[in-house]
Swiss-Prot record:
The protein's name in its UniProt record: Malate dehydrogenase
Encoding gene, per UniProt annotation: mdh
MF (Gene Ontology): L-malate dehydrogenase (NAD+) activity
Reaction(s) catalysed (UniProt annotation): (S)-malate + NAD(+) = oxaloacetate + NADH + H(+)
Positions of the catalytic residues: H177 (proton acceptor)
SUPFAM superfamilies xref list: LDH C-terminal domain-like, NAD(P)-binding Rossmann-fold domains
A GO BP annotation: malate metabolic process
Organism: Photorhabdus laumondii subsp. laumondii (strain DSM 15139 / CIP 105565 / TT01) (Photorhabdus luminescens subsp. laumondii)
Keywords noted in UniProt: NAD, Oxidoreductase, Tricarboxylic acid cycle
Cellular component terms per the entry's GO annotation: cytoplasm
Oligomeric form and interacting partners: Homodimer.
Amino acid sequence: MKVAVLGAAGGIGQALALLLKTQLPSGSELSLYDIAPVTPGVAVDLSHIPTEVKIKGFAGEDATPALEGANVVLISAGVARKPGMDRSDLFNINAGIVRNLVEQVAKTCPKSLIGIITNPVNTTVAIAAEVLKKAGVYDKNRLFGVTTLDVIRSNTFVAELKGKKPQEIEVPVIGGHSGVTILPLLSQIPGVNFTDGELAALTKRIQNAGTEVVEAKAGGGSATLSMGQAAARLGLSLVRGLQGESDVVECAYVEGDGKYARFFAQPVRLGKNGVEERLNIGELSDFEQKALEGMLDVLRKDIELGEKFINN
């Protein structure tokens, strides 16, 4: 099993690479790519960790050597959000980076499962899909927007509020991966109930958690370590699915039946072809239903922005 991390010298990429080096199954290969010249050194550094995961690093303009034979490709390349930046500022830089890297994936390992971490995910996943389509290799079961960070944040914040163990809480999060498009289904946690006030405050905290980190880091970065953990969790689940493990379920931003929007974060069962099954989002509370209806315009516009970036 070979996993490639593109953007491996960045804050998310290094954290993700460390977690994969320590947690991928024995005999796996990990390849790191970044434009930054330090990348082969990051691989050497990680190679000293005693696990049976072979690691190699590649720098420069061409990601091809890192991508050859990859089963899973995780893309975290791009600029991070700084205080005062909004998503459109990010988009202007990151859209081109994602396009360029996905073009190389389409050429070199078109059958790989692709996880997009680079923000704004609502839009960059649409860009990736259109690039793959143009190359004639798009398979909607093999492209994922990584929204796992919303899930792990929800698990943490619910556990804190209710005095539970975070590892025993699993909150499905649907919609998208920014602001109001992030919708934690707090009504679906067995044995946990919330007041209306708690629901509103908790939902808002989960939606704005990225900004919480950006502000706390005071200009020194965005959420890199928790995002690395979230991306590792999804990446390892993709690997487990490819290896034939049954009942591997994660929430991810995928192209579905278009009921709400072309791309939508929902629980999916993973397997040898990526998404084996898109699972029902279940019954929503009135609060959740209203939030879902209220976000769809924003989500659809985010998606359209990505489609137009490639097709215009």
